[in-house]
A protein has these predicted regions:
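Glycine-rich Rossmann-fold phosphate-binding loop(s) that bind the pyrophosphate
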Residues: 24-25
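A short, basic/flexible loop-to-alpha-helix module at the beginning of a structural domain
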Residues: 2-16
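Rossmann-like NAD(P)(H) cofactor-binding subdomain of soluble oxidoreductases
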Residues: 101-167
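C-terminal substrate-binding/catalytic lobe of Rossmann-fold NAD(P)-dependent dehydrogenases
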Residues: 146-152, 162-339, 358-360
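Aromatic pocket-lining residues of Rossmann-like dinucleotide-binding sites
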Residues: 35
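N-terminal Rossmann-fold NAD(P) dinucleotide-binding loop
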Residues: 28-29
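Rossmann-like NAD(P)-binding element
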Residues: 66-127
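Conserved N-terminal Rossmann-fold NAD(P) cofactor-binding segment
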Residues: 43, 47-85, 99, 323-326
Length: 360
């Protein structure tokens, strides 16, 4: 039995769980730390446009290897795309003073184009996770640019928003967050909405729980307040410390776990829709089953009419943003294989608001 296990471990078909992170700023490095701490990867390769920053992050993380589960941490090379299991793109640029939202979008689209072109050139079989903002638009851009099946290109979507929602509900009702089940759907931005029809406390529908809770006089007003707090919660963090990083790093680790461990977990990642909910030509946050192949299935939840309308409105906002992109979405160039991966680390607000606002 031991001999058979040894043969299987030495089989050339065995692939390490390599994760390449493109972007070495606050989010990329925090995710690398959380990923290493979780013991999800055998190799973590980190790249940043500012090479000195990237090398500093790698060295700082490597000095902690004695305290992590076994993992190799190093600087990424273009060839790492080829055999990576997961490629996480956090790279992006911040808005310049006086710069329009559309101009910012155009610059980030170009960055995604360059990175995707290089990944495709390496014949990668990885799943790509987009974190750069506006995440839903850039997920759609990456999907179109790569020509890959939609399941292999996903965005971080509303996973973090949903976690914030659960936290706020936990605080409001005095229930442990692990017993709160709730989702934010749609755009990772101002048009997102709370799926109250899917919200429950330990299996009890929220409306039923609320009647027994009696913690507030006006549940309708409380619902509005909680939804707005989700949308604006990151502003408070940015006002205090200038950036968000910890919660988004943990959210990305949750997504990575579903993929690297083939968990078939349900998370509200951003996925390109192909007729689900009557929508197509757009990517947004919706419940999806995630496995080692990426999105296995987009779940079509039986949403009530008002939530279906909110989802359609969110999709319309994103379609308008996609329509404003002036760069070609389909593959148009073959980059030089000798080029190193390109990225920026101006990702201090990578979970920043989508086209309809600014949020992290």
């Amino acid at each position: 039995m031991r001999e058979r296990q040894a043969i299987e471990m030495n089989d050339d078909s065995w692939k390490p769980r390599k994760v390449v992170i493109v972007g070495a700023g606050a989010v990329g490095s925090t995710f690398a730390y959380a990923l290493a701490q979780a013991g999800l990867a055998d190799e973590i390769a980190l790249h940043g446009a500012n090479r000195e920053l990237a090398l500093g992050q790698v060295l700082d993380l490597a000095h902690g290897q004695a305290f992590f589960p076994s993992v190799q941490i190093r600087e990424a090379q273009a060839a790492d795309y080829a055999d990576a299991r997961l490629i996480v793109i956090t790279a992006g640029v911040r808005q310049r003073p006086g710069e329009s939202r559309l101009a910012l979008l155009q610059r980030n689209v170009q960055i995604i184009h360059d990175i995707i072109d290089e990944i495709v050139l390496q014949n990668s079989t990885a799943v790509i996770l987009i974190v750069s903002n506006p995440v839903d638009v850039l997920t759609y851009v990456a999907h179109k640019r790569s020509g890959w099946p939609r399941g292999r290109i996903i965005g971080s979507g509303t996973v973090l928003d949903s976690a914030r929602f659960r936290h706020l509900l936990s605080q409001h009702f005095g229930v442990d967050v692990h017993n709160v089940h709730a989702y934010i759907l749609g755009e990772h931005g101002d048009s997102e909405f709370a799926a109250w029809s899917m919200t429950n406390m330990g299996g009890m529908p929220i409306e039923q729980f609320c009647r027994q809770c009696a913690k507030c006089d006006d549940w309708t007003a409380a619902r509005r307040r909680l939804t707005e707090q989700v949308k604006h919660s990151a502003y408070h963090i940015i006002d205090y410390k200038g950036t968000t990083s910890f919660a988004v790093g943990l959210a990305l680790t949750q997504i990575a776990a579903a993929i690297l461990r083939n968990q078939h977990g349900v998370l509200t990642v951003s996925s390109v829709l192909e007729g689900e909910y009557g929508l197509s030509g757009v990517s947004l946050g919706i419940p999806c089953i995630l496995s080692q192949r990426g999105v296995e299935k987009v779940l079509e939840v039986a949403l009530p009419a008002d939530e279906l309308e909110a989802l359609a409105k969110s999709a319309a906002v994103l379609r308008q943003a996609i329509a404003e992109i002036h760069l070609p979405l389909n593959p148009s160039r073959k980059p030089d294989a000798s080029e190193p991966p390109r990225a920026t680390n101006n990702e201090d607000r990578p979970d920043g608001r989508q086209p309809s606002g600014v949020h992290a």
